[in-house]
Amino acid sequence: MRRVTIYTDGACSGNPGPGGYGAILTDDATGKTREIAGGEAETTNNRMELLGVIEALSLLKRPCEVRIFTDSRYVADAMTLGWADKWRANGWMRTKKDPATNPELWERLLSLCEIHKVTFHWVKGHAENPMNNRCDEMAVEKSREYREKG
């Protein structure tokens, strides 16, 4: 099975406000990398964190073993601690009275994780990790582009 490493980051200028995401995919066998970035005019930082992971996984054309590195506790914890699966099983409710946010994005992410063998790893943001820092640069740039269009 092909192994891929993905770094992602999201950014938002205001929360909500214009936002962006950046991701870097690396084929572990060849070292070949691909950068992607995107954004939305009115969004939240958590939506951008999720969308970065979703868009990166969506590029994979066949099932892969994937390691995802993110500085988002929201994404990393929800996936590694099973929260997202629990929210889905409970009809996208975190508790009896508290709905999960971004259910349509979580559904997309969980569906992609059924295709691929995915592990999530949290990394400290704005630290000495060049891949995470590059993703942050792309996310901030996209957020800036949407703010200037605004």
Model-derived features with residue positions:
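RNase H-like nuclease fold core
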Residues: 1-47, 51, 55-64, 136-137, ...
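RNase H catalytic domain
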Residues: 11-18, 54-134, 138, 143-145
